[in-house]
């Protein structure tokens, strides 16, 4: 059974453009490695510049496989260089029942 995830990436100072580039290729690599479903992903931007990505892993096992996959690990290292992973609760938008974000065309 698929697993929906919502990931929030807060850019490090002066790393907004690099973060956008890494997020742009994230889903494609996961898909090429057979780890995510064909369901379209969504990418949004919060008011503070945090990027939010929503996508569906194929299974809990696929998530585990990602942690042993060289291509995914290399990409995640790129993420760590340009952002911090943050919980949704820190976003101002998450304090409202109907959180709204800017759509990103990635």
Per-segment meaning from a language model:
Residues 1-73, 80-106:
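Short S/T/G/P-rich N-terminal loop/turn motif that feeds into the first structured element of a domain
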């Amino acid at each position: 059974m698929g697993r929906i995830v919502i990931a929030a990436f807060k850019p490090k100072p002066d790393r907004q453009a690099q973060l956008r580039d890494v997020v742009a290729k994230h889903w494609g690599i996961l898909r090429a490695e057979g780890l995510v479903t064909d369901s379209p992903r969504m990418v949004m931007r919060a008011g503070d510049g945090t990027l939010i990505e929503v996508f569906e892993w194929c299974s809990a096992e696929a998530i585990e496989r990602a942690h042993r996959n060289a291509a995914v690990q290399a990409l995640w290292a790129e993420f760590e260089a340009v952002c911090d992973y943050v919980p949704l609760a820190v976003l101002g938008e998450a304090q409202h029942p109907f959180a709204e974000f800017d759509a990103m065309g990635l």
